[in-house]
């Protein structure tokens, strides 16, 4: 059972055509590029991939296409989380059939389950599959925070092996690291907290900004893990404006805007997400110019 999905995992955008249908050909090209530019793994149809507005059929085809393109060269992690346990089980099983390496399960949103409800949800999905599972905590979107004690309970299940922690709470991450067994990997879900999470023994990051500077983020991680904390800090501070600038409005609007400015025609976001405002687009353009990315 793999628990190491790599240090740098990119939460991949979903490219759309002008009519907002999924652009599977560009998905292939982007997946190749991300792996070539430093990504050890890819999350497909996660938050950054606009999972709420993708159909089940689109998700499964995205999983299949990315496995076909980069399977064996990078870890392919399917976003199969839902606020319906039965739907999450069904999509996880479909993802397993097309050959993904792992699945990522977001904390169920909107219906606000208790900690016991969260435990039962994730346990049920885990029992339905042989795939390794990465939990995904993002209370700013789900309105529910999975507590370190609940994660520790779930870590006793063989195929629940990692968590993407995007709550932005370093105290919570510290408590997770204290309670969790060796081999259970904690990933930062925030680009700007990658280095702090590494300092607490975290594994790496599930990144958005790696679409733009994957190689440089990999250099930062490698510097830290090899003991060159001075260089790691220098790279972190260099990239910090980009880490913050890609979240000036709802993700993935800024990163899709940035990719478009860099020549990647990944298309707009599906409604109800709106495009970047003129002021936001100008801010992103200025940031990319200052980083010499365009």
UniProtKB/Swiss-Prot annotation:
Q: Which Pfam families match?
A: DHDPS
Residues at the site labelled Part of a proton relay during catalysis = 47, 110
Asked if the Swiss-Prot or TrEMBL record annotates the protein with the keyword 4Fe-4S, the reply is no
Catalytic site: 136, 164
Per the UniProt entry, what is one GO biological process?
diaminopimelate biosynthetic process
- Enzyme Commission (EC) number: 4.3.3.7
Q: Which SUPFAM superfamilies match?
A: Aldolase (SSF51569)
Protein localization? Cytoplasm
Q: Which UniProt keywords apply?
A: Amino-acid biosynthesis, Cytoplasm, Diaminopimelate biosynthesis, Lyase, Lysine biosynthesis, Schiff base
Q: Which InterPro entries does the UniProt entry name for this protein?
A: Aldolase_TIM, DapA, DapA-like, Schiff_base-form_aldolases_AS, Schiff_base-form_aldolases_CS
Please classify the protein's predominant subcellular localization into one broad category.
cytoplasm
A cellular component term from Gene Ontology for this protein is: cytosol
CDD domains for this protein: DHDPS
Q: Which residues participate in pyruvate binding?
A: 48, 206
Q: What this chain does, per the record?
A: Catalyzes the condensation of (S)-aspartate-beta-semialdehyde [(S)-ASA] and pyruvate to 4-hydroxy-tetrahydrodipicolinate (HTPA).
- Stored NCBIfam families: dapA
Q: Which PANTHER family match?
A: 4-HYDROXY-2-OXOGLUTARATE ALDOLASE, MITOCHONDRIAL, DIHYDRODIPICOLINATE SYNTHASE
Family from the record? Belongs to the DapA family.
Q: What is this protein called?
A: 4-hydroxy-tetrahydrodipicolinate synthase
